[in-house]
Amino acid sequence: MVILDPTLDERTVAPSLETFLNVIRKDGGTVDKVDIWGRRRLAYEIAKHAEGIYAVIDVKAEPATVSELDRQLNLNESVLRTKVLRTDKH
């Protein structure tokens, strides 16, 4: 899950996320789904913002690749928060 700066235009969110998702594809992983929830109210302010643009991304990749994606997202100033969760294997 990624929470982006609410001042971004919502139409530019998906193309800007694609640049980060290329890290997954380049290392042999797959991007299963990108679900942009849109602008939502935050439970508490983050960097003086009361809202954020939420995006949920489902990927299959090696742990090192996911760590690199998380690192690059955290370096971007338009990303307020990231949360990486591993799903259970079925």
Swiss-Prot record:
Covalent crosslink: Isoglutamyl lysine isopeptide (Lys-Gln) (interchain with Q-Cter in protein Pup): 33
One of the Pfam families matching this protein, by short name: Ribosomal_S6
Lineage: Bacteria, Bacillati, Actinomycetota, Actinomycetes, Mycobacteriales
Keywords recorded for this protein, A-Z: Isopeptide bond, Ribonucleoprotein, Ribosomal protein, RNA-binding, rRNA-binding, Ubl conjugation
PROSITE patterns attached to this UniProt entry: RIBOSOMAL_S6
Disulfide partners: none
GO BP, sorted A to Z: translation
Stored PANTHER family: MITOCHONDRIAL 28S RIBOSOMAL PROTEIN S6, SMALL RIBOSOMAL SUBUNIT PROTEIN BS6M
GO molecular function terms noted in the UniProt entry: small ribosomal subunit rRNA binding; structural constituent of ribosome
InterPro entries to which the protein is assigned, alphabetical: Ribosomal_bS6 (IPR000529), Ribosomal_bS6_CS (IPR020815), Ribosomal_bS6_sf (IPR035980), Ribosomal_S6_plastid/chlpt (IPR020814), Transl_elong_EF1B/ribsomal_bS6 (IPR014717)
Annotated protein name in UniProt: Small ribosomal subunit protein bS6
CDD domains: bS6
GO cellular component, one term: ribonucleoprotein complex
Superkingdom of this protein's organism: Bacteria
SUPFAM superfamilies: Ribosomal protein S6
Functional summary from the UniProt entry: Binds together with bS18 to 16S ribosomal RNA.
Assigned protein family: Belongs to the bacterial ribosomal protein bS6 family.
